[in-house]
Amino acid sequence: MLQPQETFSNPALRDEDKHLGNLWASKKSLYKNPAHLAQQQDPWSRLSSTPTATSRSRDTFFDSKIPKDDLDFRLATLYNHHTGAFKNKTEILLHQETIEDIQGTKIQFPGECFHAPSAPITSRTTIRHWINPKKESIHSIQGSIVSPHTAATNGGYSRKNDGGFFST
């Protein structure tokens, strides 16, 4: 009986080192130490053990100066009642982090002591505030999105005159 012939036969690889290059040389490790030992040496151990400002800010810690609600947020702003009277809301709600350039500075965490920060430099030229010269009426339908639904009904749906629901 005849043996069935393989239609997709793979030729046997002979002399792999001659045709494909030295396979064993390419599989050699390029590093002296295995990864689990190299991670315990500098610079990798220093990089993995030293937290960045972002990773430290994600850690759980208690700071009594953090605003707990909207009132505390507003009280923590840089507002002086003597010099800041009759300012508008955008000028009142300025926080120290907003107006200072803190790029590359280290964040102070509980238990760490740093020198006192310099006074913030505020310039009215850097604040851009636009006020619409024409007061728009809230009852005006001009510019509103046309829709058969009204918010006054339950679930935002209104009925047609014949009792059916609007559909899109």
From Swiss-Prot:
Coiled coil: none annotated. InterPro entries: CFAP276. Transmembrane segments: none annotated. It is found in: Cytoplasm, Cytoskeleton, Cilium axoneme; Cytoplasm, Cytoskeleton, Flagellum axoneme; Cytoplasm; Cytoplasm, Cytoskeleton. Its main location: cytoplasm. GO terms for biological process: flagellated sperm motility. It holds the Pfam family DUF3695. Predominantly expressed in nervous system tissues, such as the spinal cord, cerebrum, cerebellum, and sciatic nerve. One of its GO terms (cellular component) is sperm flagellum. Disulfide bonds: none annotated. Residues 38-55 have a biased composition (Polar residues). Residues 35-61, 149-168 are annotated as: Disordered. Changing residue 121 to N: Knockin mice develop peripheral neuropathy that mimic the phenotype of intermediate forms of Charcot-Marie-Tooth disease. Knockin mice shown impairments in motor and neuromuscular functions, and aberrant myelination and axonal phenotypes. Keywords: Cell projection, Cilium, Cytoplasm, Cytoskeleton, Flagellum. Microtubule inner protein (MIP) part of the dynein-decorated doublet microtubules (DMTs) in cilia axoneme, which is required for motile cilia beating. May play an important role for the maintenance of myelin-axon integrity. May affect intracellular Ca(2+) homeostasis. Microtubule inner protein component of sperm flagellar doublet microtubules. This is Cilia- and flagella-associated protein 276. It comes from Mus musculus. The gene is Cfap276.
